[in-house]
Regions:
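Flexible loop/hinge segments at secondary-structure junctions
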Residues: 1-298
């Protein structure tokens, strides 16, 4: 912002305010600023395609990003987190970025204590990983937006979250784009896209802000917008089977809102087992809602 001041209609974040600042919120939600949640943004722990590594656990990620991957940092009680033992090849963002903050919560590492080099921007992080000459030693935390479009050169790791007995990709397999494990809660490294808007005395945002956030936060999204969200590797809330609050990354609730999982499957996998429909009269009683051309429960 310049010194003359600008009118800010919307701020965008991957985080709840209380996740970003766990001790005190900068504002009281609903008093001077409103938080509108949009689509889901998954993140991936990624390695160069030439790496032989395919998986990582949250505990191993703690050893890497919290302890530099070396047993000596732990007093010699664990084995080194080979091959990730040189923080020079940890590709991260700063302590206020969504990728770092969400990972810090899951890996139990203070967000200001991450080992690695801040690559200053998301684009720079991605490009630095693509250019690395040390494929086996390199690991980074990427938005799925960048991970998906670079699958030929970067590989997302199976992530075993705390309490799980196996690891999961964001998708059902390495070749798909269905975000199935994000949508059903098996892969919890994700955040909502948040739109923060100042609100006036009447408790409503400016006309400009309202015109924007309404498009993303109404239950039934415009189909053109829905298509663009899906094409960007994001997950619209209507395609999620689970929801969660700011309190706990793994504390999921069933999504009882309007559903578009059938349409999402058709767009990402080219097929769906759902019943097509032109109106609700075409749908059976147990899937009575006709949403985006398919019968859904809600």
């Amino acid at each position: 912002l310049d010194t003359n001041g600008n009118t800010v209609d919307i701020g965008v974040s991957d985080l709840y305010s209380t996740t970003c600042n766990t001790t005190t919120a900068i504002y009281q939600a609903g008093s001077s600023v409103s938080d509108y949640t949009g689509p889901v943004v998954p993140f991936a722990l990624s390695v160069p395609a030439a790496s032989t590594q395919v998986s990582i656990s949250a505990e191993a990620a703690h050893a890497v990003f919290g302890l530099s991957g070396k047993s000596s940092t732990l007093g010699g009680t664990w084995k080194d987190a080979t091959p990730w033992t040189d923080p020079t090849y940890y590709f991260i963002r700063n302590s206020s970025s969504g990728s770092t903050v969400l990972s810090a919560v899951m890996f139990n590492v203070p967000k200001t204590k991450f080992w690695g080099i801040d690559r200053l921007s998301t684009d720079n992080l991605r490009d630095s990983m693509l250019a690395t000459t040390e494929a086996e030693a390199s690991i980074g935390i990427l938005s799925i937006v960048d991970a998906d479009v670079n699958r030929g050169n970067l590989r997302s790791l199976y992530l075993q979250s705390p309490g799980q007995i196996s690891g999961y990709l964001p998708d059902s397999n390495k070749n798909s784009f269905d975000k199935m494990n994000v949508r059903d809660g098996h892969y919890p490294l994700w955040g909502y896209e948040h739109f923060f808007t100042p609100i006036g005395a009447g408790g409503v945002p400016s006309d400009a802000a309202k015109a924007f956030v309404t498009r993303f936060t109404i239950a039934r999204l415009d189909q053109h917008l829905l298509d663009n969200i899906i094409a960007a590797s994001l997950v619209p809330q209507c395609a999620m089977k689970v929801t969660r609050s700011a309190a706990d990354m793994g504390n999921f609730s069933t999504n009882k809102g309007l559903q578009c999982g059938c349409y999402f499957d058709e767009k990402t996998a080219g097929k769906t087992d759902c019943t097509p429909c032109g109106s609700s009269s075409d749908c059976p009683s147990d899937h009575s809602a006709c949403n985006y051309g398919y019968c859904e429960i809600n």
